Amino acid sequence: VLLSKEGDQPGLRERAQPDQLSQDAWVQGAQAAGEEDLATLIYTSGTTGVPKGVMLPHRTFTYLCADIPSCIPLKEEDVFLSFLPLSHVFERFAGHVLPMSMGATIGYVGSLASLGHDMERVKPTIMLVVPRLLESLKGRIEDGVLKAPPLRQRLFRMAQEQGLKRMRGEFAPLAGVLEGLVGSKIKAKFGGRLRYFVSGGAALPTHVSEFYLALGIHVLQGYGLTENCAAACINRPEDNRPDTVGPPLKGVEVKIAPDGEILLRGRCIMQGYYNLPEDTAATLDAEGWLHTGDIGELDRGNLRITDRKKDLLVLGNGKNVAPQPIESRLKESAYINEAVLLGDGMESVVAMIVPEFERVATWLKEKGVNVKEPEEMAVHPDVIALIKGEVQRANEGLADFERVKRHVLVPAPFSIEGGELTPSLKVRRKVVKEKYANLVDALKR
């Protein structure tokens, strides 16, 4: 479905109509395909090395299309709004193949810049998102609240407090009323019909998920890799535990190896890496277990992701540190956009921090300081002091060896164009370290 630039509804649609002969040939080819025949090659994101071609047979798609609707109540009337790249397995399966299999409607946005407008216009019921988008939308909502009159600010805070209490099963008599007063206005910005945000592609910080859930906006976090066609676990609407990625899908086995690595087995697992038999053998063992490279634990049947195995930091004193939870704590600050921890072979944990430059600029302006360029902000003494305080707050409650002892400010936001982010908005740690080698060296001194 191609969106028209005119009108308030998706309205004008153009559907490609292949000629009859090519359509017949397509149907015959589809009917002749077996479940072990190759359906597609999807390349990994390349965050930890050279991208590899993942061979996904038809069974991975047919199995998941049959099972997902038993986890999330999807229907033909649903409208999906697609903005993630179709080269990414999450969007290819859950945003393209799955809705097509059930006859749902898909709208495609023109660009990220038009996403907000398209959400109001298309009025989606389901949206696949990555954590970075939810964090960005959360920041915009909070900025809007700060500009609102005091009464509206107080109502928003009360809605958050009551909503969180309701989530935890505590007494929250005003939660429903405040959701109607506050949450409904935010939902309207998303089109007014949104049933679920489904988050994948990277770990979603618990505080971000709780922010939306407290307002009555359902965010379901799932877990999967390119190697298992994007879906292995997902939270259910009736039992949504935002600190986990939910229980496994029916037919997916999850096992935790002695070293903490998550292993997966089931009909959604790839055939292997294209023309890379050694890499395939290192990832898929003889018993059919997929070694994910992720570290996690099972909690009452739900899977919780701790970090990437390759990302674990080993300090000079031998202590192991999982960077992802600490990075998430840092990013809870309204003034920190991104954080990348370092520490291998070092005396302590250190961090490269990207400030939330727009918000920092507003903060400076309120103090009477007119500094707008990121390069200037990153070295301004007021900003350095501000971020230092935010780091100290994030360190509270951490063990001493986990605390960020030193940090530097990166003088530019991360971007896809700059190479620091993948098309699905994940941080390429290797690129960041290489691009800002001077900052890394400064932290090691």
What residue ranges belong to the model's regions?
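Conserved C-terminal "lid"/linker of ANL adenylate-forming enzymes
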Residues: 338, 388-445
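Conserved ATP-binding/catalytic segment of the ANL
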Residues: 248-315, 332
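Conserved short alpha-helical elements in the N-terminal third of ANL/AMP-binding
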Residues: 87, 91-107, 120, 125
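ANL superfamily adenylate-forming
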Residues: 1-35, 141-185
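Active-site loops of AMP-binding adenylate-forming
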Residues: 58, 204, 213-218, 225-243, ...
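Conserved AMP-binding A3 loop
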Residues: 39-65
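Conserved pre-ATP/AMP-binding loop-to-beta segment of ANL
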Residues: 20-43, 50, 73-79
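Adenylate-forming
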Residues: 269, 302-331, 360-380, 400-404, ...
